[in-house]
Amino acid sequence: PHLYPAVWRPPAAAETAMATAITLPADSNQALGIAQYAIDFIGGKYGDSIDPAVWERIEMFHTDSVMCGISALAMKTNAPCVLRGEAFDYPDPRGAKVFGSSQTCAPEKAVVANAAAVREWDSNGTVFGYNPSIPGHTAGEFGHNDFYGVVVAAAQVTGKVDGKTALRAMICLDEIRGRLAEVFSLKSYKIDHVLHGAIASAAVYGALLGASPEEIESAIGMTVAHYVPFRAIRAGKQLSDSKGSSAAISTEAAVLSMRRAMRGFVGPKDIFRNPESIFRFFEPTTGTPKNQDLIDITLGNKVRWGPGPSPFNLVLTHSGSDFSVCGMHFKIGLYEHQSAGALEGLVTLLVQNKALSTAKLEDIEKMNIVAYEPAFGIIGDPAKKDPKTRQSADHSMAFIVSRMLQKALEKGGVAASNDETWKALMLSPYDYGKEALFDPKTRALMQKITFEHGGPEYDAKYPDGIPTSMDIHLKGGQKFSSGLVMYPSGHARNTAANLKGLLATKNQMLGDLVFKDKAAYDKFISPLIGMKGLSAAQIQGIYDFDFSAMKEHQCIDGEREPTSKL
């Protein structure tokens, strides 16, 4: 029996249908509703009604994520290598595969390994959870496109999922996690943003494996009740593998929960209306007002802990073009996304001002960047001017901007367009390696950068855009001003950049770290780009390549313990 007042009603009664979407009301069992949506959407209930641009976008995000992942393995980054190695300790003839292997292992182990690799560079897709066209969908939670490996794992387990169905499932996964990011801000309560992706992963994995709505509801309940990841992994200056692998570990738990539910384990039901689950715990809907400054947890307040709705309605698109994935953003290289506005401003200044692009490093007198919160606090902190690790450097506005400017000035000029300049100056993993990290020229430029918080004027424009402006002063008095940048290249609302061309360059840059020749690169990337036309048999090997034939690199982060002690 359900713990809360409204027992699940048939979809016609519980869902408020729109032409292209359903709404799961706050007073319905949304966990069961998400389950039914995933089953219906992936199963084709709504017909072939997805706009071609959506198919193209999901294919691009998936390819981008995979190229990030395999290049992180090629550069011997720690967590991806550890987790990939761990997966082989769990062989499963009915399992899934890690990148670069034809050996099957427990699906949750393949998922954790592949997701950790995808996230390691912090260079794959980003969502800001902001959709003002839907009432209540502006919570602004972060998120990243880390979870596509869940779909491929399910496809490999069943052997029955073709490329088009796999892409449809990826659209579904991004829709669920993206819309949850729009209605509930996890970071406001120090919960890591990856939980929304874990919920979506449980739903989609279950739907692909033929789970019932009740089994998926059970898995979502287990994921939320047992595996809430807090932002302790991101606190202060400490950096660990847990930060980059947070999505992977949460998704491992989600897939494991789904497998347990399909074996008959019954988890908590109706988790979004559960008063002691995170949603109503942090945003009460009965007995006390929602107040982020004061959460009333008085146990004697019976109304507070009694029956009530969830804190939000949830709209999920099933047809047309207004899918969550279409509002997600690409990174044109390696950088923290909050710096994208500054990088676009820099590229524009270099293209438009020959006096700047042909200057010498010593000609730069000072630079000032004006940004919004949270960018000012996250990557503009003065303490970030002395990064000592790759992970702290890619969250340092000073380092990121200085590195790109240094590359431009050392070239002695730039191309005539923003697109070609982005391609030439694109930041690669080597820009965050041990040598680059302590490059004296980069460090000298960093000391010339100052930051300002743009105040309410800038803050109000985020997360619709990435409001940033930049001034660069040369010795002798010349000043170059970017003006306000809102939608940099890669941003979902940017219409000026040739996104396909930029991503092709990025894919090639990352692929060159992995493959020794163009033939091997083309063989690997072609199925990713043409995934919609692949058969179920071809999906089985979509992540296969000869791991032993990869280009050989030293570990990008320096020497590490080479073997496990287990």
Locations of the language-model features?
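Well-ordered alpha-helical segments within folded domains of soluble proteins
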Residues: 144-153, 197-204, 251-256, 339-343, ...
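Glycine-rich, mobile lid/loop segments that gate access to catalytic sites or pores
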Residues: 155-256, 270, 275
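Hydrophobic alpha-helical hairpins/lids featuring a short glycine-rich hinge
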Residues: 121-174
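Amphipathic, well-ordered alpha-helical segments in soluble domains
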Residues: 34-37, 146, 169-172, 176, ...
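Intrinsic-disorder-associated, low-complexity terminal segments enriched in Asp/Asn/His/Tyr and depleted
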Residues: 2-4
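Short helix-coil transition sites and intra-membrane helix breaks within transmembrane domains
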Residues: 139-144, 190-195, 230, 331-335
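Terminal-appendage/accessory-domain detector
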Residues: 8-140, 242-252, 259-566
